[in-house]
UniProtKB/Swiss-Prot annotation:
Domain Ig-like: 94-179
GO cellular component annotations of the record: plasma membrane
Disordered as annotated region, ranges: 63-93
Protein topology in the membrane: Single-pass membrane protein
Keywords, sorted A to Z: Cell membrane, Immunoglobulin domain, Membrane, Transmembrane, Transmembrane helix
Subcellular location: Cell membrane
Keyword flag Transport: no
Species per Swiss-Prot/TrEMBL record: Mus musculus (Mouse)
Positions of transmembrane segments: 214-234
Function of the protein: May be involved in osteoclast differentiation.
Name under which the protein is recorded: Immunoglobulin superfamily member 23
Amino acid sequence: MNCLRDSGRGLIPAWETLLLTGALLSSCTCSATSKLPQMKGANTQLPVPGALEKDLSTSWFPELEAQPPTSSSPKGLPGRPRTSQEVPNAEDNPSLIPLVTFPESSKGIIYSDLNYSVILQWMVTMNPEPVLSWTFDGKPCGTGEKLFIRRLSPDQLGTYLCIARNTDKELVSEPVTVSLSPATGAPTVPAPTVAYPMKPNDYMSVSGGSAIALIVAATIGGLVLIGSVCFYILLALKK
């Protein structure tokens, strides 16, 4: 009996300890929740120690911080941005103005025959009045509104263009190429003839019966000539 009484008395402090622990936990939880902001839309932020906050700010997604910013092209795609030198401007490269030619050009080519006339003319309007200069294969060949080739020669076959300059700007004409007609073609060089060797003292030689006949005929002819001369001299003396 004494043992049972002693054991019952020893259980009371354990239950009291559990009750006290539960009361302390509930009071701590209520006090923590009461301190949170109650306004609508407010962000709940828990306090973070200074050292931990520094570590998070420096080590959070390091690969994103090391990556350089991506530049975008005009179409919004990632890549190297374009510059003014890469994008041609139509105002800096105006369309070429065609020339007025005689004979008429076909796809930038004038077909003509040698020793015929070729006329090139460029009618351009600029303010102030421009100075027109012509070039032949990149070399200056004349000035003025017209370029007149009186007799076309092989040396004048090539590309011509005109440049107009004034104090404000410079314009370039459409280049034209002067070429021979397809039917005429380039001037042909005569084929070399075969040369036969010849001896320094080579002459027409006669031998045999033909040589004897030639000598006899020459002798008879000489005698007839001398006889006729003597005959006419005698007749003159008799008179």
